[in-house]
């Protein structure tokens, strides 16, 4: 699917888009998802990462899958400058930050989403590795991040914030993020505020995310869940409000 194809589908009269599930919660199958829920998912991620209108987003994943579609939807929801390149194992090859699709992006790409293999390949080429440090927020999904790749990412210089995602097609991309590098690096996934998590008797993760999925989802991932204290900061009319709240987070222990 091309970008033009997806935008045509997005802008048609239907309130739904066709996607195909990944098989995380059962046998892969086609499903129709509501555009408003995709916008909800986009808004949640953009708010979490602090993305704002005029920031840039790199589309380097196939639009045949939910991850690529959601990059476009985030750019629509938050009025981001979309940088579209052909899906490949080297997404940053031949990118000039002074002239991206005819626009100077001030020396950085604000947001990018990649699969682990794209990240690994990028790190093997010095020029591409250098460009990666000019990405402000990188989310990695669609596969496991092995220990050696995670260690290499933690050693990257610059101000890049790198996140591992947890989610599936049914949740319209991710419902939780885990910081890989920096002072906030952790092995625990932090669900978004609108997401509730629990476990089955077998220890499998149960997801209740009504803004993005109408049904409660039972996954095949065996997890450990713990509570932690979180200092929530909200800013209204230039006045900051601090609130200490108790939240749940999880880490993956295995598969059923």
Task: Kindly label every feature range from the protein language model.
Residues 159-203, 209-216:
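Conserved ATP-binding loop and adjacent catalytic segment of the adenylate-forming AMP-binding
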Residues 125-183:
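Gly/Ser/Thr-rich phosphate-binding loop
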Residues 206-256:
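Conserved ATP-binding/catalytic segment of the ANL
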Residues 16-43, 50-52:
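Conserved AMP-binding A3 loop
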Residues 3-20:
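Conserved pre-ATP/AMP-binding loop-to-beta segment of ANL
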Residues 47-51, 129-130:
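Glycine-rich helix-loop-beta junction characteristic of Rossmann-like nucleotide cofactor-binding loops
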Residues 35-40, 56-121:
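AMP-binding/adenylate-forming
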Residues 21-24, 57, 72, 112, ...:
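Conserved S/T- and glycine-rich ATP-binding loop of Class I adenylate-forming
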């Amino acid at each position: 699917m091309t970008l033009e194809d997806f935008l045509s589908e997005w802008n048609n009269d239907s309130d739904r888009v066709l996607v195909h599930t990944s098989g995380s919660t059962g046998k892969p199958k086609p499903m129709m998802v509501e555009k408003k829920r995709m916008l909800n998912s986009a808004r949640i991620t953009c708010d979490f990462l602090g993305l704002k209108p005029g920031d840039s987003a790199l589309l380097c994943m196939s639009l045949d899958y939910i991850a690529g579609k959601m990059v476009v939807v985030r750019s629509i929801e938050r009025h981001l400058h979309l940088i579209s390149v052909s899906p490949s194992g080297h997404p940053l090859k031949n990118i000039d930050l002074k002239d991206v699709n005819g626009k100077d992006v001030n020396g950085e790409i604000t947001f990018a989403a990649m699969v682990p293999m794209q990240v690994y390949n990028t790190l093997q080429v010095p020029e591409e590795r250098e460009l990666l440090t000019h990405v402000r927020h990188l989310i990695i999904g669609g596969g496991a991040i092995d220990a050696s790749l995670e260690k290499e990412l933690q050693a990257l210089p610059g101000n890049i914030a790198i996140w591992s995602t947890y989610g599936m097609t049914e949740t319209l991309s991710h419902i939780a993020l885990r910081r890989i590098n920096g002072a906030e690096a952790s092995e625990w996934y932090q669900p978004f505020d609108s997401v509730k998590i629990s476990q089955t008797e077998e220890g499998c993760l149960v997801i209740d995310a009504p803004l993005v999925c109408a049904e409660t989802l039972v996954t095949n991932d065996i997890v450990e869940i713990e509570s932690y204290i979180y200092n929530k900061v909200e800013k209204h009319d230039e006045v900051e409000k601090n609130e200490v709240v108790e939240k749940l987070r999880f880490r993956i222990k295995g598969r059923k």
